[in-house]
Design a protein with these regions (language model features):
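Conserved acidic
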Residues: 1-233
C-alpha cells in the first residue's frame, strides 16, 4: 500500500500499522470524543428486520427499515456541490445564460431551452463524517475477514477471492462447506472464533437473530461460476 495525503480513520490506520504499514508524515488530525451516537438507530434497523423474519406481518416494515438504513449512508455521502439549478428559458434568455460563469449545460426542446447552472450558494449541511466512517469501518471489517479469518484458517490453495464490494465478498472455495477447508491444527480455534465472523448455528432462533447482526458474514448466493472484476482489496 502506498498513498499520500489521505483521510483515514484511526481504527483503520491502527490495523494497517499492526500489519506493518509505516506512516512517514501526518499533515493534520481531527480529534473527536469517541461515542456510539447512532447505536440506537442501528439497533432499530436490525431489530425491525428481525421482526420481519419472524412474523410475515412485519415483513414489509422490515424491508422499509432496510431502505431507511441504507439511505442514511447514501444521504450523508451526498455531494451538494454537484447540484444544479434547472430553468426553462427562451432563446434570448438562453443566449445570456451561456455567458454566465455558472452555466453548465443546456438542451433544446422546441422553442424552449432547459438550462443547467451551478448554484450561486451551496449549503453543505450533510453529515459527511457518517458516510466517511461507514466506508472506512466497512473496509476495516473486510480486511479483518480476509487477513484474520480466510488467510488464517484456510490454505490459500483452497480458495480464491473473485470480487469484493463495500460490504460483500465473492470467493471460490474448494469445497461446498468452509468447515471442510479449515486447517486441521486450527479446527478447535475455529470453533471458538467462528461466531465472531458468522451467524450462530446452535439454534434456529440464534441463526435468525444473527442473520440481521451487523458485521457478521452471511451467505447471499452460491453458484458454480462467476465472471468478475478484480477484487477491491
Amino acid at each position: 500500500m502506498s498513498a499520500k495525503k489521505i483521510l483515514i480513520y484511526y481504527p483503520l490506520m491502527e490495523w494497517y500499522i499492526q500489519q506493518g504499514l509505516i506512516v512517514t508524515k501526518v499533515y493534520g488530525m481531527i480529534h473527536c470524543k469517541k461515542c456510539k451516537i447512532f447505536k440506537s438507530f442501528g439497533e432499530l434497523v436490525c431489530n425491525e428486520r428481525r421482526k420481519g423474519d419472524i412474523d410475515a406481518k412485519y415483513k414489509v416494515i422490515g424491508e422499509e427499515i432496510k431502505t431507511i438504513g441504507n439511505s442514511s449512508y447514501g444521504r450523508t455521502s451526498m455531494n451538494k456541490a454537484k447540484h444544479n439549478k434547472t430553468s426553462y428559458e427562451t432563446q434570448q434568455e438562453y443566449k445570456k445564460s451561456v455567458g454566465s460563469p455558472y452555466f453548465r449545460d443546456a438542451d433544446k426542446y422546441g422553442e424552449v431551452y432547459e438550462v443547467q447552472k451551478r448554484k450561486h450558494n451551496t449549503n453543505q449541511n450533510m453529515c459527511i463524517q457518517l458516510s466517511s466512517a461507514t466506508l472506512q469501518y466497512a473496509k476495516l471489517r473486510m480486511l479483518q475477514f480476509v487477513y484474520e479469518f480466510l488467510y488464517k484458517f484456510i490454505d490459500k490453495k483452497d480458495f480464491n477471492i473473485m470480487y469484493m464490494d463495500t460490504d460483500s465478498i465473492y470467493s471460490a472455495f474448494a469445497s461446498d462447506r468452509i468447515e471442510d477447508l479449515i486447517k486441521t491444527e486450527l479446527k478447535s480455534l475455529y470453533e471458538e472464533e467462528k461466531s465472531l465472523w458468522f451467524p450462530r448455528t446452535d439454534t434456529p432462533e440464534n441463526t435468525t437473530y444473527d442473520n440481521r447482526t451487523a458485521g457478521l458474514f452471511k451467505t447471499e448466493f452460491t453458484g458454480d461460476g462467476m465472471c468478475a472484476l478484480c477484487p477491491k482489496l
